[in-house]
């Protein structure tokens, strides 16, 4: 049997053992906890002195510093070029992480290897030293177990009830001399033979420090037992937690402590409260400190570790791949740490709502307390809602959090004033200021589904908050106290009002004050780009007056777009030098991300699909555009006799067609205005993707008109030069609706013939919306749904009629798409586009 197979078998056995032990512990712990009166536990908690809690948390955070001696010994033994301060900071972070997700200390060992591998040339010796540290976590307990074996600590009660524990103690105790002898005979460094002994002493002191923290928890909850008996129970519990491989020893450690103190006659409610306080002080507090420290550490260490690893250097491509993600992860560590701290802060102060309610019940001025309670609750909820925004480095979310911290501070100062909590709020506030200066964006996009989710989440949190307060008051039997119930009745609505006011103020600040940040290039730059590189079927719409422009740094390419509802809706493909499109889009997306806007492309071709895909977009087919090949177009032949009949009819009625070049006279514009107004019939003009009747816009291109025999304009169409591929398009097509004549046919036919005479080779007749969308059962559901709309809702909008009409000109159909981010909603994106088109 080779070593690899042995390792696999060992891993399977280890996992099986840990799983079986976890199931056993969970079942036993459930049985024990089922008999505990949680109301009595809450009563006991309400009796605890606050100053004692503060001292406990300080002691819990400080006790982990002892473990830093491992790293001090390690750095000195290997003569690492690293400052003592950095060693202490890094060690604290490692040990806090190891305490939560330890798996017998293997997590801490792995992180140590990653960090310190960069500071020594002898990697083998480093691994040997780290192995000693890992094993010494058990040898410290082994030394303490010896003290139980020799009856220095009294564990007789628990040993009499659980006899097999005695044999575990013997085995663990016997491990100590073996380890000391081995570490001295075969040390990792011959000049440091006593490293194993030093680590054992550090481990022993650290376990004693943890025991003191738990013992102090017992003193706080008035669970008085002799220290000698207590320490014996703690050692046995620690052994159980360590060998269980369960992160933090959760369950196994707690079960032994619960059973041990039960044998000493301590009420289970007090033991449970003692364990909760211990977990908070010895695990939660150090993690908070570690999160703060991690905002400033680990960046260069992790980077150098990956760069220097022998497994990655030979594989250059793989290294580049991993390094790209590694840099992203490292960059997010500070914001992630702060987001976690803000989350914990909101949770802690949500619990403190109970303190405000409790104080209010015994104070005559209920109204003041409940206004403060509403402010406190609102601030906590806002803090919680902006955790993701803080992680995403949004300035708006950080400002929300800063305002929330200030409101919580005010409510705390006027109610349950605690200097330690106010100090903590000040620390978080300072970290938020630092984060605000580093933030990469002003705000995140506002999406409807996110708003709905936040509303539902807020209602859920407020409901849970109400249940928590009500349940606690019931458990403490203080509902009998007389109070102003009318104030309680309006507490929920007052909270909602405060949240709405704060959100409204910040939203106004960012949506209006920061709207000045939006920039737009000059139209002259766009004209120069089109003249040099050509345009497209939509490029003439730069003159419509309802768009802004974004150019690249060298002014060789641009986009035309419009802002609407936290989105930048771009019309068509980029224009200009195709080699600059990547740079242009990257700059545009960076610009949009900074301002917190979504990016939507409307009516783009399939030519640049790979480019849009690179920016994390998905596509929806809007329909197809009819492009007529003028080289093949003719009114001759049997199939075209309908075209000839239409043209002949206009000739018989003395209706003429002509192209009028700008500039236009006021009289001519007034004639067109008369036709346009009658054609619109009080309907609203469309915008953005089409032009509108505007003298300045119309004066940018020729206009085709049809006149009756009195020389009055009865129909007109505006031309749209495209500046590419010898193509031309039309925009506005309007006629007098009271005339029973095929004026649209006449305009199209005359325009087609005129365009062909002028040497154009392509004529764009516009898009047939939803045409040829979702026709296969393999298509996306959203496209199949759109296809059904095309087929069955022709009465609301002439989808099929529009395609049939254009098909008689035998065009080539080119697809047009909507491009939107993959995490956006299609229907919300379509809604924003429609709002842009229908509202100027």
Swiss-Prot record:
InterPro entries on file: Acyl_CoA_acyltransferase, L-PG_synthase/AglD, LPG_synthase_C, PG_lysyltransferase
Q: List GO molecular-function terms, semicolon-separated.
A: aminoacyltransferase activity; phosphatidylglycerol lysyltransferase activity
> What is reported when this gene is inactivated?
Strains lacking this gene do not have a detectable amount of LPG in their membrane lipids. They are also more susceptible to defensin and have a higher affinity for cationic peptides.
Q: Which UniProt keywords apply?
A: Antibiotic resistance, Cell membrane, Lipid metabolism, Membrane, Transferase, Transmembrane, Transmembrane helix, Virulence
Major enzyme class: transferase
Source domain of life: Bacteria
Q: Which residues cross the membrane?
A: 9-29, 53-73, 90-110, 129-149, 162-182, 201-221, 230-250, 272-292, 338-358, 370-390, 395-415, 416-436, 451-471, 490-510
EC number in record? 2.3.2.3
Extracellular compartment spans:
30-52, 111-128, 183-200, 251-271, 359-369, 472-489
Q: How is its activity regulated?
A: Inhibited by cadaverin or RNase A.
So what does this thing catalyse? Answer: L-lysyl-tRNA(Lys) + a 1,2-diacyl-sn-glycero-3-phospho-(1'-sn-glycerol) = a 1,2-diacyl-sn-glycero-3-phospho-1'-(3'-O-L-lysyl)-sn-glycerol + tRNA(Lys)
What Pfam family does this protein match (any one)?
A: LPG_synthase_TM
Localization annotation: Cell membrane
**GO biological process terms held by the UniProt record:** lipid metabolic process; phospholipid homeostasis; response to antibiotic
User: How is it placed in the membrane, per its record?
Assistant: Multi-pass membrane protein
Q: Which GO terms describe its cellular component?
A: plasma membrane
Q: Which residues lie on this side of the membrane: Cytoplasmic?
A: 1-8, 74-89, 150-161, 222-229, 293-337, 391-394, 437-450, 511-840
Q: Which family does it belong to?
A: Belongs to the LPG synthase family.
| Function according to Swiss-Prot or TrEMBL | Catalyzes the transfer of a lysyl group from L-lysyl-tRNA(Lys) to membrane-bound phosphatidylglycerol (PG), which produces lysylphosphatidylglycerol (LPG), a major component of the bacterial membrane with a positive net charge. LPG synthesis contributes to bacterial virulence as it is involved in the resistance mechanism against cationic antimicrobial peptides (CAMP) produces by the host's immune system (defensins, cathelicidins) and by the competing microorganisms (bacteriocins).
Q: What is this protein called?
A: Phosphatidylglycerol lysyltransferase
What is the protein's species of origin? Staphylococcus aureus (strain NCTC 8325 / PS 47)
């Amino acid at each position: 049997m080779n070593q690899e197979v042995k390792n696999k078998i060992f891993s399977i056995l280890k996992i099986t053992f840990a799983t079986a032990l976890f199931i056993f512990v969970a079942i036993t712990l459930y049985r024990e906890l089922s008999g505990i009166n949680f109301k009595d536990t809450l009563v006991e908690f309400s009796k605890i002195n606050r100053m004692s809690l503060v001292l406990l948390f300080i002691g819990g955070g400080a006790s982990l510093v002892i473990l830093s001696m491992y790293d001090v010994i390690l750095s000195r033994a290997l003569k690492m070029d690293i400052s003592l301060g950095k060693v202490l900071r890094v060690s604290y972070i490692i040990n806090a992480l190891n305490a939560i997700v330890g798996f017998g200390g293997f997590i801490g060992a792995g992180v140590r290897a990653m960090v310190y591998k960069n500071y020594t040339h002898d990697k083998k010796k480093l691994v040997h030293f780290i192995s000693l540290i890992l094993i010494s976590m058990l040898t410290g307990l082994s030394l303490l177990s010896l003290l139980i074996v020799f009856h220095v600590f009294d564990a007789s009660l628990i040993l009499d009830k659980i006899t097999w524990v005695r044999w575990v103690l013997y085995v663990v105790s016997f491990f100590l001399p073996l380890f000391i002898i081995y570490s001295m005979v075969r040390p990792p460094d011959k000049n440091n033979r006593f490293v194993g002994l030093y680590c054992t002493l550090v481990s022993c002191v650290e376990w004693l420090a943890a025991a003191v923290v738990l013992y102090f928890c017992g003193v706080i909850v008035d669970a008085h037992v002799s220290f000698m008996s207590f320490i014996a129970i703690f050692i046995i519990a620690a052994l159980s937690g360590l060998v269980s491989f369960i992160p933090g020893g959760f369950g196994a450690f707690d079960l032994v402590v619960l059973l041990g103190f039960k044998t000493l006659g301590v009420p289970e409610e007090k033991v449970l409260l003692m364990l909760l306080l211990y977990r908070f002080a010895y695990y939660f507090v150090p993690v908070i400190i570690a999160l703060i420290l991690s905002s400033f550490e680990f960046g260069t260490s992790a980077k150098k570790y990956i760069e220097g690893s022998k497994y990655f250097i030979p594989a250059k491509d793989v290294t580049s791949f991993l390094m790209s993600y590694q840099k992203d992860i490292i960059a997010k560590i500070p914001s992630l740490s702060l987001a976690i701290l803000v989350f914990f802060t909101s949770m802690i102060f949500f619990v403190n709502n109970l303190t405000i309610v409790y104080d209010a019940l015994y104070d005559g001025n209920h109204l003041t307390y409940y206004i403060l309670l509403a402010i406190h609750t609102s601030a906590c909820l806002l803090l919680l809602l902006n955790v993701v925004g803080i992680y995403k480095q949004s300035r708006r979310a950080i400002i929300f959090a800063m305002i929330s911290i200030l409101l919580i501070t005010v409510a705390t100062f006027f109610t349950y004033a605690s200097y330690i909590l106010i100090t903590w709020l000040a620390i978080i506030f300072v970290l938020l200021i630092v984060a605000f200066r580093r933030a990469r964006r002003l705000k995140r996009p506002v999406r409807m589904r996110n708003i709905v989710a936040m509303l539902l989440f807020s209602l859920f949190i407020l409901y849970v908050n109400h249940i928590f307060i009500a349940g606690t008051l019931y458990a403490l039997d203080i509902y009998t106290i007389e109070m102003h119930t009318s104030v309680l009745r309006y507490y929920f609505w007052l909270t909602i009002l405060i949240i709405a006011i704060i959100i409204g103020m910040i939203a106004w600040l960012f949506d209006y004050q920061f709207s000045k940040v939006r920039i737009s290039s000059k139209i002259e730059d766009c004209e120069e780009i089109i003249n040099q590189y050509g345009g497209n079927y939509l490029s003439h719409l730069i003159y419509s007056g309802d768009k802004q422009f974004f150019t690249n740094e060298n002014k060789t390419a641009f986009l035309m777009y419009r802002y609407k509802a936290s989105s930048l809706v771009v019309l068509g493909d980029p224009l200009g030098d195709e080699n600059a499109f990547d740079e242009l889009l990257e700059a545009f997306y960076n610009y949009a991300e900074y301002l917190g806007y979504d990016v939507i492309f409307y009516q783009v071709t399939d030519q640049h699909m790979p480019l849009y895909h690179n920016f994390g977009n998905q596509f929806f087919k809007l329909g197809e555009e009819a492009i007529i090949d003028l080289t093949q177009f003719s009114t001759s032949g049997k199939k075209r006799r309908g075209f000839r009949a239409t043209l002949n009819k206009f000739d018989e009625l003395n209706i003429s067609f002509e192209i009028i070049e700008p500039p236009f006279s006021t009289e001519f514009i007034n004639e067109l205005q008369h036709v346009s107004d009658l054609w619109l019939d009080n309907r609203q003009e469309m915008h953005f993707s089409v032009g509108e009747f505007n003298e300045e816009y119309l004066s940018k291109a020729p206009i085709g008109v049809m006149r009756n025999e009195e020389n009055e304009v009865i129909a007109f169409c505006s031309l749209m030069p495209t500046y590419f591929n010898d193509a031309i398009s039309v925009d506005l097509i309007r006629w007098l609706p009271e005339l029973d004549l095929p004026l649209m046919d006449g305009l199209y036919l005359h325009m087609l013939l005129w365009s062909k005479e002028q040497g154009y080779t392509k004529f764009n007749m516009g898009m047939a919306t939803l045409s040829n969308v979702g026709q296969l059962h393999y298509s996306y559901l959203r496209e199949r749904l759109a296809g059904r709309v095309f087929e069955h809702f022709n009465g609301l909008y002439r989808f099929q009629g529009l395609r049939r009409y254009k098909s008689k000109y035998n065009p080539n159909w080119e697809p047009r798409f909507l491009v939107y981010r993959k995490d956006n909603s299609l229907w919300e994106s379509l809604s924003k586009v429609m709002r842009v088109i229908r509202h100027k």
